[in-house]
């Protein structure tokens, strides 16, 4: 067997999904940072998003950095049914699960941190539980964006958790998250050009602070 034959195939995303909730009352909340990430990609790549009833979400496609075709999706099913929308796209285009990259919020990561992985559990995130159920596997890449924990909250304080994830960032946090989203675009562009595993080395090693420009 040649050395080339033993090299693992690069995982290159073909569909990028941002998780969130529809309705204006959820706009710019911490739980909707996945939506914000896909919107940032849409602006950067000049791919317009439009509501697609068949896909139960806002959908767009175009050419991404690296020259390949890329699809963007914001499920409009509400968070805990996100998998329905994702499955509608993957079934229509016959995309394998490993070609789907899902972006979502993570309270266990501090603000300014991101984590890119090739697979994993839902980690208690209802949107990811739905995605895993509808894709029938955990083996697809995901990018978690840290939103931090509510200040001074006990781990079992569910009401505080809900108000935190459905709350909005402060002015200073918004500035920081703007930089985080720029970094997310860079990480995803690297994953499209060199594969998710290569992008992990960059995405997982930095903390984005307000001092960066």
Swiss-Prot record:
Reaction(s) this enzyme catalyzes, per UniProt: an N-acyl-L-alpha-aminoacyl-tRNA + H2O = an N-acyl-L-amino acid + a tRNA + H(+)
EC number: 3.1.1.29
Alphabetical list of PANTHER family matching this protein: PEPTIDYL-TRNA HYDROLASE
Superkingdom of source: Bacteria
Record's subcellular location: Cytoplasm
Residues that bind tRNA: 26, 78, 80, 126
Keywords of this entry: Cytoplasm, Hydrolase, RNA-binding, tRNA-binding
Gene name of the encoded protein: pth
Lineage: Bacteria, Bacillati, Cyanobacteriota, Cyanophyceae, Nostocales
Name of the protein described by the UniProt record: Peptidyl-tRNA hydrolase
GO cellular component, as recorded: cytoplasm
Organism name: Nostoc punctiforme (strain ATCC 29133 / PCC 73102)
């Amino acid at each position: 067997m040649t050395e080339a034959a033993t090299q693992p195939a690069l995982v290159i995303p073909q569909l990028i999904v941002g998780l969130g909730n529809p309705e204006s009352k959820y706009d710019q909340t911490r739980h909707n940072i996945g939506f914000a990430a896909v919107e940032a990609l849409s602006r950067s790549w000049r791919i317009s998003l439009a509501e697609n009833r068949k896909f139960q979400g806002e959908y767009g496609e175009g050419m991404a950095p690296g020259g390949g075709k890329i699809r963007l999706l914001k499920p409009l099913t509400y968070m805990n049914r996100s998998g329905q929308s994702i499955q509608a796209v993957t079934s229509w285009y016959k995309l394998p699960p490993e070609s789907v990259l899902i972006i979502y919020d993570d309270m266990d990561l501090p603000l300014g941190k991101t984590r890119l992985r090739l697979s994993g559990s839902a980690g208690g995130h209802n949107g990811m539980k739905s995605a895993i159920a509808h894709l029938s596997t955990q083996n697809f890449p995901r990018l978690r964006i840290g939103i931090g924990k509510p200040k001074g909250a006990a781990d079992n304080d569910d009401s505080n958790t809900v108000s935190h994830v459905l709350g909005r960032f402060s002015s200073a946090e918004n500035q920081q998250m703007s930089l985080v989203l720029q970094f997310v675009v860079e990480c995803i562009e690297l994953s499209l050009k060199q594969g998710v595993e290569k992008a992990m080395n960059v995405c997982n090693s930095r903390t984005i602070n307000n001092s960066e420009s």
